[in-house]
A protein has these predicted regions:
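Short acidic (Asp/Glu) and glycine-rich catalytic loops that position anionic groups and cofactors
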Residues: 27, 90-96, 240-244, 313-319, ...
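A short, basic N-terminal segment
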Residues: 1-60, 397-434
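C-terminal alpha-helical "lid" subdomain
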Residues: 174-190, 194, 311-315, 325-434
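Amphipathic alpha-helical segments in well-structured domains
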Residues: 44, 76, 108-112, 254, ...
Length: 434
């Protein structure tokens, strides 16, 4: 095994179970990512540059583009983990038919509610950290003069809907000082966007405004600005599965959603938003399709289209769109070594796979038709964990025979054939005539 795998730290069983079960099911684990992260140094370095900008009071907007299974969600979760460790608050949501950026039936508000439900900090990485953030702010205001609190909230009051938002913050602070749990929960309910009608909010809070489908993004900007008052560096918003906007059948509804993206893009790049970073993940089709994708909205296409100087070997990682490149053969080898160590530690067995076996496994994966352009880490990981499960449950199984039975021609030794010079196993497929 390589030094990377042999020196790997022991993974707690609970974390190992989440990693293995999530990856075998084709989804990204929300915990334990540092144990299995490989590659993506260039992309991660570019996104970490954005975090520095956010901490300085700026804002950023990025698209992560890659095929299904290429590692978009994995990279988003990796950045999420790193941002929380650096003192940022992270909110993430996956779009769906019920959750969009804009909709006539509350789909935009549903996305906001999902973001707030998943709001996370270093001490509450699993989400649901809104009350923790509010309580931290209340504690920071405990021994300061009221004029200091007013000065702290003054920049928020100048923002759109800032007066209503700061009024709720003051109400929460008063309720916390008086031990009024019911009033505190009502303010939390308001911030989460759970009041359905203005009359309901007026009856319980005396407020005639509620967070709605049209203005939820304004409150995201307010929350990002408020987080700095609570001692955090800023807010990172991660929105995945943009393909669900591409799938909207109604062209006008699609355009409204892309218009919302344009608003967010303009706000962050023009300096209208502060302490806020936005990262959206989507497939190449959902972004670049000129008929239904993001590029169908001309104002966005003209802003996001790649310039004339970037090319395949010279990527511009400071551009708004980051296109994920496939992991290299060597990076995948390191990844499956790490997975083998985690699997062995969790199930308490000694793998019989040698490094040559791991290389043979990757040869089989890369030996598929179309693997050069269509093989993704998700497929490699899923197959490898399945192989480990089989070997763990069948200790007498011969690894080489198992790989040979699946790989066949991919593992056949290259042999000169006298007429074509191709590998013997592939001779019948070297050429054909239609």
């Amino acid at each position: 095994m390589s030094d990377t795998a042999s020196a790997a730290p022991r993974v707690p069983k609970r974390v190992a179970a989440v990693i293995l079960n999530s990856l075998k099911g084709g989804v990204v684990p929300r915990i334990g990512l540092p144990y299995i992260t490989v590659g993506r140094e260039v992309e991660i370095r570019a996104l970490l540059t954005d975090l520095s900008l956010i901490a300085d009071g700026g804002a950023s907007f990025r698209f992560l583009v890659g095929r299904y299974g290429a590692g978009k969600s994995f990279l988003l979760q990796t950045i999420r983990t790193h941002a929380m460790g650096e003192g940022f608050v992270v909110a993430d949501a996956d779009l769906s038919p019920e959750r969009r950026l804009q909709g006539g039936q509350g789909q935009g508000l549903a996305t906001y509610r999902e973001l707030i439900r998943n709001i996370s900090t270093k001490t509450r990485p699993e989400g649901g950290a809104l009350n923790l953030i509010l309580d931290r702010w209340v504690a920071s205001c405990a021994d300061v003069d009221e004029s200091v609190v007013n000065a702290q909230l003054a920049p928020l009051e100048e923002m759109v809907h800032g007066f209503d938002f700061t009024r709720m913050l003051r109400r929460y602070r008063m309720a916390a000082a008086g031990g009024d749990e019911e009033a505190m929960s009502r303010v939390t309910k308001w911030i989460r966007g759970e009041y359905r009608t203005k009359s309901e909010a007026r009856a319980e809070l005396g407020s005639s405004t509620i967070i709605s489908d049209d203005d939820w993004y304004d409150y995201v900007k307010l929350i990002a600005r408020f987080l700095v008052c609570s001692g955090y560096k800023g807010m990172l918003v991660l929105i995945d599965e943009l393909v669900n906007l591409y799938k909207i059948p109604n062209a006008i509804t699609r355009q409204y959603n892309y218009e919302k993206i344009l608003t967010m893009y303009n706000d962050t790049l023009q300096g209208k938003a502060q302490y806020l970073g936005m990262i959206m993940g989507g497939t190449p089709t959902s972004i670049e399709d000129r008929r239904r994708g993001v590029f169908s909205y001309e104002a966005l296409r003209s802003r996001l289209a790649q310039g004339r100087f970037a090319r395949e070997d010279l990527k511009d990682m400071l551009a708004p769109i980051i296109r994920l490149q496939p992991l290299t053969y060597e990076e995948l080898l390191v990844l499956i070594e790490k997975l083998m160590q985690i699997h062995a530690g969790y199930f308490g067995w000694t793998p019989t796979l040698t490094e040559n076996d791991l290389v043979d496994f990757l040869k089989i994966e890369f030996g598929r038709v179309g693997a050069d352009t269509h093989l993704t880490p998700r497929e490699v990981i899923r197959d490898f964990i399945e192989l480990l499960d089989i070997l763990c449950q069948n200790p007498d199984a011969n690894v080489a025979e198992l790989l040979q039975s699946v790989g066949g021609d991919a593992l056949a030794p290259a042999a000169a054939t006298g007429d074509t010079g191709t590998a013997g196993g592939n001779r019948n497929f070297a050429e054909f005539t239609i």
